[in-house]
Amino acid sequence: MTLRFPLLTAALLAAALALGAIVPLHAHEAHEHFSAGEPGDPKKPFRVVQVTMHDDNGAMAFEPSKLEVKRGEQIKFVIVNAGLLAHEFVLANEKDNLKHAALMRKYPDMEHDDPNAKTVQPNAKSEILWRFSKRGTFEFACLIPGHREAGMLGAVIVK
């Protein structure tokens, strides 16, 4: 009987650790649904668009802040952080970005390196290759708490 208790405890501990490893996988799988299209194919033609991040004098912005693309078009975003702070470029629909912004308020140090999202440090750059397979209006935003609200928001109109 004394041997059963340690074995049961070890089995429960192993199950808890396994469950802890599985939950983040499922959370990440749910994140693999992209509202604004899908990751691009580098073997196919694409247009290059540079988006510069600014945070001058307390104002935060993307330049350009609006982009029009054709459905099916691939865009290679070259994202340049010309500011003094770290910023993000998260491409999604407004609903998904607002939902993700709420998560960022809970976990403000979370960094992104996803097909549709990058964290870019000051004086650095990153790239996203994206295929806009759906019509509609989508947004790119910095979801670091307070940045979206300070103006770090742009629109992609897919026709």
For every predicted segment, state its role.
Residues 28, 114-159:
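Extracellular/periplasmic metallocenter environments
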Residues 90-97, 144:
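Short, compositionally biased
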Residues 43-74:
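N-terminal edge beta-strand
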Residues 64-91, 126-134, 158:
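Beta-strand cores of secreted/periplasmic/IMS beta-sandwich domains, seen most often
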Residues 95-106:
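Short aromatic-acidic-glycine turn motif
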Residues 47, 73, 85, 116, ...:
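Residues that flank catalytic or metal-binding motifs in active/ligand-binding sites
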Residues 2-53:
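Extracytoplasmic entry segments of secretory-pathway proteins
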Residues 59, 105-114:
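Short beta-strand and strand-turn-strand segments in soluble, beta-rich domains
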